[in-house]
Amino acid sequence: LYTILWIFILTLLPYVGFFIYLFFGLTFKKKRVANKIYKIKKLRSRKDVTNSDKKELRRWKGLITYLEMSTDNHISANNNIEPYFTGKEFFENLKKEIKNAREVINMEYFVFKFDNIGKEIADLLIEKAKEGLEVNLIIDGVNTSNFRLKRYFKDTGVNLYFFFKTYIPLFNIRLNYRDHRKLTIIDNKVAFVGGMNIGDEYLGKGKIGYWRDTSVKVFGDVVATFEKEFYFALSIVKNKFLKDEKLPVEPTLKYEEEKSIYMQLISSGPNYEFPVIRDNHIKLIQEAKKSVFIQTPYFVPDDLLLDTLKTAILSGIDVKIMIPNKADHLFIYWVNQYYIADLLRLGANIYRYENGFIHSKTLLIDEEVISVGTCNLDYRSFYLNFEVNLNVYNKEVANAFKVQYYKDIAISKKLTFNDFAKRSIFTKIKESVFRLLSPVL
């Protein structure tokens, strides 16, 4: 589809299309950047693959091995987790942990708005920097508040970096590759990840209204992997390797901890040979025996993921997909419509969330494994953006997400194929046209 789109643009607009392709279609220079990234990763983690023969992990051994081999991020034990399903919960806990920080605060966000909550977080970071803490903040280069933030943080002690900064967007060939990650790591003891950026809209104060999202706070051995991922991004924005002593080492998996929560942080991006998070989702769905519960604001699966979902439906798996009833970006509503049509016909349970906007990015399998993070189910997240997701292999944690999913169903509208089939020809044309544009949305 991505190739077809560019052929269409270059045929329709041969001269203008060339320049559009130059800035939006060029492939990331994988060899040069990937070699640097892999070199960094090898400096800071074990060479062996985890022996995941623990009873709770045996079923997922193939997936765990693939994720370790492809990302060099190992599964860990001795962890705990707190999920947050509202912006209020998330920001209250984020502010509390920042205030309690004693050594270092590392933050990496796709969006950091200079609004009420953004200024509040910024002031806390400045306060901590003045106390003598190391404070590092990485923000994606297309963030609209970057200029104001740069002025605000000047001479405060906060180390501010922009990921692939774009002073003049149309003259930046890296414009297409964004840091879509949302991470906070404090004192190498606690970390946050999920769908929420820094901004008032995540508190439901934007034009779109109530904002339903999911982020988690984690404690334990897995935090070392969060640190590792952050320093990977820091090495890119600094354009230099980091000294060995700066790089955390992931602890060896300890099987004697009977009540351990097993977690694995996974990363994906144009620097990798494979679309790791997409592969993670496909493997999880293929392993499902009872249920697949998905929440995503953007449902634009590639052919392989779509076929995997179809196979699951036809195999009798309870496939539920929840998408927004309103869109925060132009065209997304119609693209979502295109892809759910076939799944509805085959028997999927599709829900439109009606209490505002749902931005949650979760995949729940058999009430046993939950994958939560920054990755949407679309081409951009799978192939172009830098993303992170956290796999949690624990029934109790998975059950907490299941309970929330059913709460969301209660305020959602279930779609039926008969009603959906009554869409007008004009609506179907819009869906098909916008679907063609989906790789660059």
Where are these regions (language model features)?
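Helical hairpin unit composed of two closely spaced alpha helices linked by a short loop
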Residues: 288, 298-319, 324, 329
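A short glycine-/small-residue-rich loop at the edge of a beta-strand within enzyme catalytic domains
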Residues: 272, 296, 300, 327-334, ...
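A beta-strand-loop signature enriched in Asp, Gly, Thr, and Trp
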Residues: 315, 320-365
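N-terminal localization/anchoring segments of enzymes in phospholipid and broader phosphate metabolism
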Residues: 1-278, 283, 287, 327, ...
